[in-house]
UniProtKB/Swiss-Prot annotation:
Subunit structure: Composed of two subunits.
Protein name: Probable ATP-citrate synthase subunit 2
E.C. code: 2.3.3.8
Keyword Transferase: yes
Alphabetical UniProt keywords: Acyltransferase, ATP-binding, Cytoplasm, Lipid biosynthesis, Lipid metabolism, Nucleotide-binding, Nucleus, Phosphoprotein, Transferase
Localization in the cell: Cytoplasm; Nucleus
Originating organism: Schizosaccharomyces pombe (strain 972 / ATCC 24843)
A GO term from the CC aspect: nucleus
Length: 492
């Protein structure tokens, strides 16, 4: 599982499309009819400002107005109803941060967005550009109709939390909420009576049927579309003659990215223009194919925009069952890691910090899960390219190629790919005076170490090679000049 946050726009689109389409998890029949209104969600995205085109420039302001004009064309309803406007960039507690515009006309919403588009915004300790907004209809309601619901996955199953208080001042929901654990075996899904008695004991009885149906439908989508986390706050429940109308006003969600091969088409069709009622200028067929729609986007956390290289590795990672991760911490740093294994990557980063070079640690990342030769080669090239940019440093740079004891990843395969990448960048590695320190163990590790050592000799690279006789992070103090250099591994 790889739980990744998604935008509120995407979460609401998936939920709206599949709420009445996903097969019910419950063996009992629904008691109420779920009337799904037309989906009205407008995603407004602006480009990142640059040094050439800053947010205050006339050119950027013109881009903003062009985006607004496109929104009016695709979503004519924005001019016909009161609206809610808010950034959609994985920002928590937007209401508390003044990042929520309520009960606004389209002109008022535009002005509010206009003042913030492309501008730097500080939210707690994070600072980032506001470039993506969500606009949707405002739902008037009294405060006492706001509730809270959360579904999250744990080893034992899925927890459903429900609280009869919701909104920005909900407080400690973990302490307040009533909780129900849905077992991993969905054949043991709780009965309607259990759901009502466990979660809804503080809710008027006349609303139970509508809310139980909504909870079952919500959980069915959660399972069907491979969510790992889903929070709605507030969930507005407005009493009616037939029970209640339910509205999900604010939503935070995570999907299992590794389920894209299974659910990618479901995520895509829910966000296709036809599903969202978007008026397009081209020919409209009205038909929605199973594989029609845009691929899911997993944005970086607010204040942490992905670099081109990070996005490239993320793309590689999304296309494989292996794991390829890269985060640039300090592009000017002296110490770089090319490490196999999530656990080993933490150990190496920690060892660098313990040896007094935390401020020089350039990247954090890992490759694991038996990536192919081509995937490892592309990953290694990306790291080496980043490492050898800019002006060479007088003190040179250090590259640690390491890992623990591999289980099913073959060091022989991955090291052949890394050796090819070293050959591609041999001139730049020499120019930047890069010393290379290798430690690896696991199946066929001898062949892997032999290949990497021969590459060092072939390309005349300053490269030291160690096997399992060296502690997993034992080469770090040696590479940083904090410990004597020990004898290298020798082929038996």
């Amino acid at each position: 599982m790889s739980a990744k946050s998604i935008r509120e726009y995407d979460g609401k689109a998936v939920l709206a499309y599949w709420l009445n389409r996903s097969p019910s998890i419950s063996k009992e029949e629904y008691k109420t009819v779920s009337a799904t209104p037309a989906v009205q969600l407008a995603q407004i995205q602006f480009p990142l400002p640059t040094l050439v085109i800053p947010a205050e420039s006339t050119t950027y302001r013109e881009v903003v107005e062009d985006v607004f004009a496109k929104v009016e064309q695709e979503h004519p309803w924005v001019k016909e109803t009161k609206l809610v406007a808010k950034p959609d960039q994985l920002i928590k507690r937007r209401g508390k941060s003044g990042l929520l515009k309520l009960n606004a006309t389209w002109d008022e919403a535009k002005e509010w967005i206009r003042e913030r588009a492309g501008k730097n915004q500080k939210v707690q300790h994070a600072v980032g550009y506001l470039t993506t907004f969500l606009v949707e209809p405002f739902v008037p309601h009294p405060p006492n109709t706001e509730y809270y619901i959360n579904i999250n996955s744990v080893r034992e199953g899925d927890w459903i939390l429900f609280c009869n208080e919701g909104g920005v001042d909900v407080g400690d929901v973990d302490a307040k909420a009533r909780k129900l654990l849905v077992p991993v075996r969905l054949s043991e899904f709780p009965s309607r009576a259990t759901i009502a008695s466990t979660l809804l004991s503080d809710i008027p009885v006349e609303q139970h049927e509508s809310l139980v149906d909504f909870i079952i439908r919500l959980y069915s989508v959660y399972v069907d579309c491979q969510f790992t986390y889903l929070e709605i706050n507030p969930l507005v429940v407005i009493p009616t003659a037939k029970g209640a109308d339910v509205f999900y006003l604010d939503l935070a969600a995570k999907l299992d990215q590794t389920a894209e091969f299974e659910c990618g088409a479901k995520w895509a069709v829910a966000r296709a223009p036809e599903s969202l009622g978007i008026k397009t200028s081209g020919e409209e067929s009205g038909a929605i194919n199973a594989d029609h729609g845009p691929p899911m986007v997993f944005p970086a956390p607010f204040g942490r925009e992905l670099s081109k290289e990070e996005a490239y590795v993320q793309g590689l990672d999304a296309k494989t069952g292996a794991s390829l991760k890269l985060t640039i911490l300090n592009a000017e740093g002296r110490v770089w890691n090319l490490v196999a294994g999530g656990g080993a990557s933490v150990v190496y980063a920690d060892a660098v910090a313990v040896n007094g070079a935390a401020d020089e640690l350039a990247n954090y990342g890992e490759y694991s899960g038996a990536p192919t030769d081509g995937q490892t080669y592309e990953y290694a090239k990306t790291v080496l390219d980043l490492m050898t940019r800019g002006e060479p440093r007088a003190d040179g740079k250090v590259l640690f190629i390491g890992g623990g004891i591999a289980n099913f990843t073959s060091p022989a395969v991955t090291f052949r790919a890394i050796a090819r990448a070293l050959g591609d960048y041999k001139d730049k590695l020499h120019a930047h005076k890069v010393s290379i320190w290798v430690r690896r163990a696991g199946p066929n590790y001898q062949e892997g170490l032999r290949v990497i050592r021969e590459a060092g000799k072939k390309f005349d690279l300053p490269l030291k090679v160690y096997g399992p006789e060296c502690h997993i992070s034992g080469i770090v103090p040696m590479g940083l000049g904090k410990a004597p250099v020990e004898a290298e591994w020798q082929m038996a």
